[in-house]
Amino acid sequence: WGVGRRLSEHLNKAKITNALQLADIDPQYIKRKFSVVLERTVRELRGQRCLNIEESISAKKQIVVSRSFGTRVTDLKTLKPIVSNFAVRASEKLRNEKQKCSQVSVFVRTSPFSDHMPQHRGYKTIELFTPTNDTRDILIAAKKALLPIFRSGYDYAKAGILLSRFSNETSRQFSLFKDPNEPKENSEFMKYIDQLNNYETQIYFASQNTKRWSPMKQNMTSPKYTTDWYELPKAN
């Protein structure tokens, strides 16, 4: 309950040696003599809820979607749809958190274990003029971040996308500098897309690979007992 050794010594001097005795003490006395935190502990021991659910769950600071590749990726044509898949998935997570982001970062790297191969790490962050959770905005930013960090001649082993600098999705912030050619944010449209894709992905953006995580490393995945007829468990 957050009662450490030093605090225990002070409680023992007050003849409080167990949780039952602590629960019987007047919370106001505990607040005066010790702290608000310990007073809250006393109230919780009495069965009183002191924190709302919203206070207990801290909001995420960032969302990361990344994968290691089962086969090395050497060309931008293959890498683009992979990063697009990451951007779409990260956008879905962002909307589930009821947040918007102001930064989109993309990273790529070769395998640090392949000492005999040329090594390269690339990382780029795009600042958004206005916070968004619209997949289309995040896809555009991801593409802008990927192009300058890609280098031909390297065997890439991993890539990923990171969304950060969050704000509540109900907040509104406008900018005079937003590119008019960028798609307008439409929360209802994205909500509709999420509903359609709730169980199995049915709608893809043009920049995506329809095999969502290909060519990812999937040799250690668990059998799909509930979604694939060919992987149903067999009873002898």
Which residues does each predicted region cover?
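DNA-contacting surface of Y-family translesion DNA polymerases
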Residues: 12-153, 171
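Acidic, metal-coordinating catalytic segment for phosphate/diphosphate chemistry
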Residues: 129-236
